[in-house]
Amino acid sequence: MEIKKISATKVIDAPAEAVFAVLADPNQHTELDGGGMVKGPEGEAAPLGGIGQVFSMNMHQDGLGDYRMINTVTAFVPDSRIGWGPAMDPDCEAAKNFEGVDVSGHTYTWDLREAEGRTEVTETYEWTGVKDPQFERIFPLVSEEDLEKSLDKLAKAVG
């Protein structure tokens, strides 16, 4: 069976509550992006508060240009676990490049485990839910190195 996930782990010198607060704030996601795609939310975004919450994020990739992702919170356990699944906003200009292709089914999840004031953070990128074979061919969309960079940036953002 093909493995459809990658992950990276880092210990951050901060309590889980502080790490979780940064991850739960979409306004800070540009500071965390190890792949260089996240440009920020439209205006001021509310903090994430539970499974099913939706937030949008402006993105950019060379070759695709500017686009917007609609993210749905898929995991939410305060100070322990948070994650979301992105899907392209069908109303953004770049969506026409994917007409007829289901560009959903992948998730980003962070698991936090605190010990002695420090937090072990594991970021997992998973695409087991991708149903469209055309879309699945281009996975993974990020690398383990991107996840490692993201964790390094998270450590800096937590301060």
What is each stretch, according to the model?
Residues 51-65:
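Short, charged, low-hydrophobicity "junction" segments
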Residues 12-14, 63, 90-92, 127-129:
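Beta-strand elements of well-folded, non-transmembrane domains
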Residues 3-11, 17, 54, 68, ...:
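Intrinsic-disorder/low-complexity, polar/charged segments enriched in Ser/Thr/Lys/Arg/Asp/Glu/Gln
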Residues 1-51:
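Hydrophobic ligand-binding cavity/cleft-lining segments
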